[in-house]
Amino acid sequence: MKLTHKILLIIGLTSIMSSCRQDIVPNELLPKFDRILQDPTALTQYDFSESTPFHHIALPFDFGSNQFHDSLIIDKLENTHIKYITYIYSDYKKVDEFKQEELNRERLYGLYQYMPNLFDDDEVEWSTIVQTGGQTEKQATNLFHGFVVHYRPSPTMESMKAEIDYLKSMIDTALTFVAPTTEGTSLIITLGTDIAISDSAGFYYERELDFSTVTAHTSALGTYDFGNYFNDTSVSAVRNRNKHWERMLIHCDLTGSMSPYSAQLFVWHRLNIDKNKVQHFVFFNDGDMTTDDQKKAGKTGGIYYSKADNFDDLQKIAYKCMSNGSGGDAPENDIEAMLEGFKKCKDCKDIILIADNWANLRDYEFINKIDRPVRIILCGTQFGINKQYLDLARATKGSIHTIEEDIENLMDLKEGQEITINGHAFVIENGRFTEVKKI
């Protein structure tokens, strides 16, 4: 009888121990977490060196643990715009009975307890990577396990001043090394290295962009090439491929972190100003210093206009736009800026929007007011394409342009049809683009 009780006790304890992991995560959160975890990308080993030069912070776990290695790191993400989060784990099991999916959920729940809003934010994009390179416990322990969070700091007056100083330095250096009248000359610029902080295991905690210019020189390649430091040289790449654009009206987002792209635009324009390719510029910063709760879609403000024929005046207006624009959240007033631009140039031929792929359209609801084709140069597309800009291009019979390709046929897509852009598949559902998850 006593033996029977012992057996029952052992069975009971085993049952409790096997179920305690899943009890950590509330049932109502399981659908959110499972959507993030579905269809992971398999890699032998996650390599931080392949990350982009955007700000990012790593939040590591020890192998097999659901406790953050150092939860204080999460404080660095306060007052930031988080756009992309990657969860990384390995598939090695010390015992066959181990349930990896439960540990994955627990780790997500650990992040949820600190930042629950991330899991309900439609602007945050998630991905999951499973590492297959750990064939032993020692090998698996040496792999990174945790989250990599890509973010941008919220703009401040100080950060915008730093971006203006960088932009001035970039333009001045470029124009010193490349004569405006030189035909078939390219500008190659190497920028300062990034800042990395690592823990004792060698994992990056943080990586930031340094705006200083290190070297600049010319070559005879016939294009404007901004070097290999930036993974995204969208503006120069698109302009080099589309030399037929003319009588342009260019709308350029000058909110925080857009200076690497606006630098390419300004240098290109200065080197081509005598060709009269561009007639007008419109810069926008999403409402100047207006606080987020006071911004109204369609009437946000922070829009600045300049003719294209005087480069000095153009720079002054651009810097004024940047100086006045440090009070914002992520969405931008692209539609409002374009409607203002149309008033200035009714006979412009090619309408260009240089847009921040990280930011949604604050005034998306007014897309139907744009009655001219818009050529959208998307900046920051390393992690995917913002669907709202696809909708804008299709609705206006315009086009999307990334560092890799030009997509001109969006207006021809019918309901239910699919298209692949930069390796991401999209389908038209209810008149809008929806990303297709590949299984």
What are these regions (language model features)?
Residues D23-E28, K94-E101, M258-A263, M289-Q294, ...:
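Extracytoplasmic/secreted cell-surface and envelope-processing proteins
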Residues E50-D70, I85-Q100, D122-T136, H244-K349, A359-L361, ...:
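Von Willebrand factor
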Residues Y89-S90, D253-T255, M338, K346-L361, ...:
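DG-centered beta-turn motif at the end of beta-strands
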